[in-house]
């Protein structure tokens, strides 16, 4: 395989790399001279000294580099949209570059706190590494513009939305916001709630898109998922992966910049848990995939709690445990209904490996344990009568459905259990919020 920078994409990449080298060198000089304090307005200023002028020139250079980055991103999504290395790598590089600019803006407006200085430096290093790797990769793999079929913009937007699994995102945001209200014992400020929920939505959507990239071949064999954008071939795998990576990176920096670092790293942990531990390692490897993998969906209330308190405590861990215990009976009920799909796709779900009778038994056992866990919050004195009454009522109905699943074979009662368990979790966390506010 011959290295060449003759393609237009490779040339753009090299030119962008050189511009970033100059930008970084200028930024280093500005940092050594502490020029930021002489150009404190953002994005432009009227410098009163040579050091302030140097800072202004650095920002203008960053603006020029930003245009180059946007052009590179556009070119990649036009000419390399089916390349599983170049398109994701370009998307990550450009996203990190703008994340660095975002952190740089926060540095100036927040008087250069140490944590943002460290984040700015580490992000700059990540941009350097990814751009260097992209330049070398473009020399080996880039090609000139290929004629792809025209795109239906409306269908395209619909497919991007589908990649994020919006229904799941909505449920996760309910538990995130409930964690905020329960942690603060009050209604959070609009700005904090907005940034936390936006960051959470992007994190959940990004991990959902990456999950669909990983499962694209599996999804083709399942009736429930065969029409997803990647499985159906309406989008290339590279596009799905790139979109997911971009959303995930943006989510981290939004959390870190506008919420706090603990919430940001918890959100990042949720992405890694879902993508790596569950999607890549557990889903096709063990019958315990749902049990262990359930921790990914249990992280959002921790993120919400950390957003308002800056810490974690026992009630937050109980919220995590509630969702962790809720996940197996919820998804095993679905697995009973979709057993043939999972069997065809080779996914070792409990009904496939141990049979429907054992699965129905485990649904009941885990439901009993789940309902018991929900009473831990009033037991430690953290919640009051509203939550306790709701936990009893909702839990009683859930136990009724679980008992019916245990006693009756077939899809009908399992589907009813699956549908109600979704509403159960939502209403339980809504009750938690009401209890915290009264």
Question: What are the language-model segments listed below?
Answer:
Residues 118, 236, 399-427:
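Interfacial loop-to-transmembrane junctions
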Residues 178-198, 250-265, 301-323, 375-387, ...:
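Helix-coil boundary and interhelical linker segments in multi-pass alpha-helical membrane proteins
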Residues 224-265, 356-379:
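Multi-pass membrane catalytic core of lipid/isoprenoid biosynthesis enzymes
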